[in-house]
């Protein structure tokens, strides 16, 4: 029985990091993060004229597009005050790609929530409760290791990390834009570096909590 239970336990350990990372990313990818970032004293101003209110308006609209079920026309129909479209064709193509990644990430997140919750509900089965919480504990430790490595990479060379991250999900070069393009004006590198840092800190916090919780509960079970 223990050998059989080690298989789902191993699976739980592996999915905990993905669950925590996606949860933290979803928390950060919210309008309140844009409110916080755009209003930071040291946040870089847009050299091409966007005010903080402009950035909040268009930034939140763009974020909404990524998480809603609307088609590309949700953004492509938007015009800037000078009559030009909010995003040019290359930018819109990238936003469509980003939405696909985000929507896939949401589906994966929901599945992970369901798997972890179902496994937790099944802890009434003889012998499984200890295996489950031990797996959660190990998943927390694994997450801590991964996040420390990511935070180190961010601290040492964020530009390289950022490029590698995009190359993982998008066609080479499709995510590179001019400084005058709307995407760069709305979402400068400062916003991304802070976002990755906050996501890492939230994930690390969740991992520590789960590892402590799993450790305590697994040891209380005889």
Language-model features, listed with the residues they occupy:
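Hydrophobic secretory-pathway targeting helix
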Residues: 1-34
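Juxtamembrane interface at the cytosolic side of transmembrane helices
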Residues: 2-11, 113-160, 209-222
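Alpha-helical transmembrane signal-anchor/signal-peptide segments
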Residues: 26-47, 167
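Hydrophobic alpha-helical transmembrane segments
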Residues: 46-59, 81-91, 106-120, 137-156, 201-206, 221-222
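Individual transmembrane alpha-helix segments
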Residues: 68-111, 190-200
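Juxtamembrane non-transmembrane "cap" segments at the membrane-aqueous interface
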Residues: 155-179
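Terminal transmembrane helical module of multi-pass membrane proteins
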Residues: 174-222
């Amino acid at each position: 029985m223990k050998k059989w239970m080690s298989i789902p336990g191993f699976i739980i350990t592996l999915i905990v990091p993905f669950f925590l990372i996606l949860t933290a990313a979803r928390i950060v990818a919210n309008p309140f993060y844009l409110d916080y970032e755009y209003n930071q004293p040291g946040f870089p101003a847009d050299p091409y004229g966007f005010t903080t209110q402009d950035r909040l308006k268009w930034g939140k609209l763009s974020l909404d597009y990524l998480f809603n079920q609307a088609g590309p026309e949700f953004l492509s129909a938007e015009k800037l005050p000078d009559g030009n479209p909010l995003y040019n064709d290359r930018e819109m193509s990238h936003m469509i790609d980003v939405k696909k990644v985000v929507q896939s990430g949401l589906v994966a997140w929901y599945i992970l929530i369901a798997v972890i919750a179902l496994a937790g509900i099944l802890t009434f089965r003889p012998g499984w409760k200890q295996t489950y919480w031990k797996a959660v504990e190990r998943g927390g430790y694994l997450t801590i290791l991964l996040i420390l490595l990511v935070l180190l990479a961010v601290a040492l060379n964020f530009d390289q990390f950022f490029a590698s991250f995009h190359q993982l999900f998008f066609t080479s070069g499709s995510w590179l834009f001019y400084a005058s393009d709307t995407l760069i004006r709305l979402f400068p590198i400062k916003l991304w570096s802070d976002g990755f840092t906050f996501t890492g800190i939230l994930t690390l916090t969740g991992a520590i909590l789960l590892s402590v919780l799993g450790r305590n509960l697994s040891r209380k079970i005889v």
